[in-house]
Each structure stands twice: as C-alpha cells, then as structure tokens.
C-alpha cells in the first residue's frame, strides 16, 4: 500500500470491534474530518446490515456508503431466496469480493463486519484490497494505535458483551484524548442472540460513568 493511499485510510476516525462469548460489540467515534478540517461532528460510522449483522466504516464516506448499500441488498436477497439470514462469514466474504473486484480503482475504506448467526458471534476486518481476517478484537482508523494499547491490555477470551462494551468505549475515549481525527461523541452497537441494536444516549451514559 502506498503511503498516500494508507494516509487516506488512516486519517481520522477510530472504530473498535470486540467479539465476546455471547455477542459482538462495535464502537466508533462521530467525527468526520478532511485534513485538519472537521467536516461533520455527528457522523454515524456504525451501520446495520441486517437484523443480526452490522459494520463500522473508516475511510472515504461515499465509498463506505456504497459498500453498505451493496451488502444490505445482498443480505435481503439472501433472506428472500434462502429463507434465512446470511452468515456473518459469507457477509465478510461478499465484502471482500466487492473490494477485490475494484482493486484497480479501490474503495478508500476499511470495514469491520460483525454479527451473531447460527454459529455464534463473529467479527471480521476487510481492508481496501479485499483481505479478510477473522478477529477477536480489532480497531481501525488513525486512533487505532492508542485504542490497541487498551484492547491488548484488557481483552480476554471469556469476555461478556457487558464487559466488552465497557472496554470498547474506553478504547475509543482514549483515542479521542490523543488523536485529533477522533472525537465528537461515541456510538456503540451490540449484536447477540437478540439481534442488532444501537445503545441509546442514556445507555451509553450509564456505561461511560461506570
């Protein structure tokens, strides 16, 4: 990856994904930046793909939104044709295929796909060239070096969703303190046996204050 392309992906944003024993947590800040200019301070970087799956976005907004639309379409199509939800692994492979087919003119995005299916919780990282990695925990964006420090210190294989969401929030908060491309609030989503749901402001406040 050239330095110029890598800079486009890494500049701004911190997203975090954690796979717990009973679900997946996705967390992201709300700042959209263009260089040193804050373009938007209320950006939703966590998107619902289906009732059981979601993703986080880092990189170019237009490219990332295009990928979200494609994944939603195919996930809905799978429900119609197969009479059931697409697996999280298949969703990640589809995302990989989209990136790989466009590698000549790559989407400037880095995606975390997570969810809960018949096999349990699953979390994947897909980069702009289509590489797929299954993850226990992962962070993307310019604040990721800071967030990784906290994740590596606190992650355990037996984490519950309740514990994971606290760690994810602390990781993004740490990035907000140290990274100028990260800020303006935090969103967090949980995917477990009860499906996809975003935490409300009251629920986030309760976790942050713990």
Swiss-Prot record:
Signal peptide: none annotated. It is an enzyme of class 3 (hydrolase). One of its GO terms (molecular function) is threonine-type endopeptidase activity. GO terms for biological process: proteasome-mediated ubiquitin-dependent protein catabolic process. It comes from the Archaea. GO terms for cellular component: cytosol; proteasome core complex, beta-subunit complex. The active site is at 13 (nucleophile). NCBIfam families: arc_protsome_B. Belongs to the peptidase T1B family. Component of the proteasome core, a large protease complex with broad specificity involved in protein degradation. This is Proteasome subunit beta 2. It comes from Nitrosopumilus maritimus (strain SCM1).
